[in-house]
């Protein structure tokens, strides 16, 4: 069975430039929306997963979903600190950080609208446990003082959080003495200060979370057994990366489901547009189809040729839409994580999986939009097609 050359199919698309551009443009818009939504969810998840270190473990109160909801009293923290699975630093001290985590309300710099921001009580050991955090402006806060440092996203996005400015919360004025960058992690959306000073100011007696590094990643199971077998403890331990990944799950799913639904609705219009274009192509090339059949090309060859034309149309739209979506990686975004009730800044992330999904989506639109017109072309008899000429 002779096949119609691909070059012939491509030339037919170029011969109808206006309809090709309009149809491919419609598909490109749908793919742009589809890819952008997937990039949004991927960026959120990547940011929160990157927040944790692979060898770090976080301990929170049993049943708590976030650090803000958690509370660990000092006796419980002291028990955990004795576990032999916790790594020690060069000075012989256990690499464990006891941290209060609180939400405060700050006005956004541009709009003045209030939003929740995480305040974390940090310790020198806590800084050592997060090597991705580095001061990029000013200096680190001094322990025992009312000094704080702000993540880059907070310093840029909220009033009073830039270096040299003052924030008032917990009945005290706090001076921003530095800005830190934590890479593409959730710490960029936090403010850090001295842990003990924050506990006193917020009149708290318990920590929100314990973070420590393991001697050996395999020691996590032993830590969990120690906690579960001790009736004095009402806490649980999780790998830090898993803990922060879980916090992104609900919002990422919501974004993905909403975006996919919108994309499917939009795709119906794009499919109809492709179908109209392909039907018009079949109608204008009736005599051509008859000639191809007279030259010995089978119905299947005609079907495949018109389907290939629709698939090429979808592929062109997919590549254009994906190219447009890729520029969204340069756009920073912040939103409320309704699982933690705090502001989080992140960026769109384009992954190979998203590229594959977007192109596959474009090809599916092309196939669905082109199948019926292609089937109509394949069903034409030689006599009827030539007579129509």
Where do the language-model regions lie?
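Hydrophobic, regular-secondary-structure patches
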Residues: 32-118, 137-139, 144, 200, ...
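Mechanotransmission and gating elements of multispan inner-membrane complexes involved in transport
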Residues: 87-90, 107-114, 140, 156-260, ...
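Transmembrane alpha-helical interface segments in multi-pass membrane proteins
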Residues: 266, 279, 284-333, 357-369, ...
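Short, membrane-interfacial amphipathic segments enriched in basic
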Residues: 1-7
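C-terminal membrane-exit region of the final transmembrane helix in multipass inner-membrane proteins
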Residues: 3, 354-389
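Hydrophobic alpha-helical transmembrane segments of multi-pass inner-membrane transport and secretion
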Residues: 17-44, 252-288, 311-320, 365-368
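Short beta-strand boundary microenvironments
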Residues: 115-157
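Short juxtamembrane loops and helix-capping segments at transmembrane helix boundaries
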Residues: 328-356
């Amino acid at each position: 069975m002779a096949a119609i050359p691909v070059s012939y199919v491509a030339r037919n698309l170029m011969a109808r430039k206006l309809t090709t551009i309009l149809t491919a443009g419609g598909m490109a818009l749908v793919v742009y929306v589809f890819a952008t939504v997937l990039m949004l969810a991927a960026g959120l998840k990547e940011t929160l997963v990157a927040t944790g270190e692979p060898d770090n473990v976080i301990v929170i109160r049993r049943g708590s979903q976030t650090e803000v909801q958690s509370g660990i009293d000092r006796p419980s923290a002291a028990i955990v600190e004795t576990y032999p699975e916790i790594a020690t630093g060069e000075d012989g001290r256990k690499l464990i950080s006891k941290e209060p985590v609180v939400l405060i309300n700050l006005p956004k710099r541009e709009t003045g609208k209030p939003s929740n921001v995480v305040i974390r009580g940090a310790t020198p050991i806590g800084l050592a446990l997060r090597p991705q955090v580095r001061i990029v402006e000013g200096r680190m806060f001094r322990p025992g003082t009312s000094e704080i440092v702000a993540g880059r996203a907070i310093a840029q996005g909220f009033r009073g959080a830039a270096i040299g400015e003052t924030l008032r919360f917990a009945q005290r004025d706090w001076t921003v003495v530095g800005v830190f960058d934590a890479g593409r992690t959730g710490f960029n959306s936090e403010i850090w200060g001295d842990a003990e000073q924050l506990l006193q100011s917020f009149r708290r007696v318990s920590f929100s979370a314990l973070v420590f590094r393991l001697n050996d990643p395999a020691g996590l199971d032993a830590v969990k057994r120690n906690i579960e077998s001790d009736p004095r403890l009402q806490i649980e331990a999780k790998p830090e990366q898993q803990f922060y990944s879980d916090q992104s799950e609900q919002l990422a799913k919501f974004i993905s489901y909403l975006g996919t639904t919108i994309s499917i609705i939009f795709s119906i219009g794009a499919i109809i547009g492709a179908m109209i274009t392909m039907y018009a192509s079949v109608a204008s090339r009736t005599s051509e189809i008859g000639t191809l059949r007279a030259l010995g090309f089978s119905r299947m060859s005609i079907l495949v040729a018109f389907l290939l034309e629709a698939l090429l149309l979808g592929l062109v739209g997919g590549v254009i839409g994906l190219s447009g979506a890729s520029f969204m990686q340069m756009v920073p975004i912040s939103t409320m994580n309704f699982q933690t009730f705090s502001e989080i800044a992140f960026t769109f992330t384009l992954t190979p999986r998203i590229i594959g999904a977007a192109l596959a989506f474009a090809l599916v639109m092309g196939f669905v939009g082109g199948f019926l017109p292609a089937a109509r072309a394949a069903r034409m008899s030689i006599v009827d097609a030539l007579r129509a000429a």
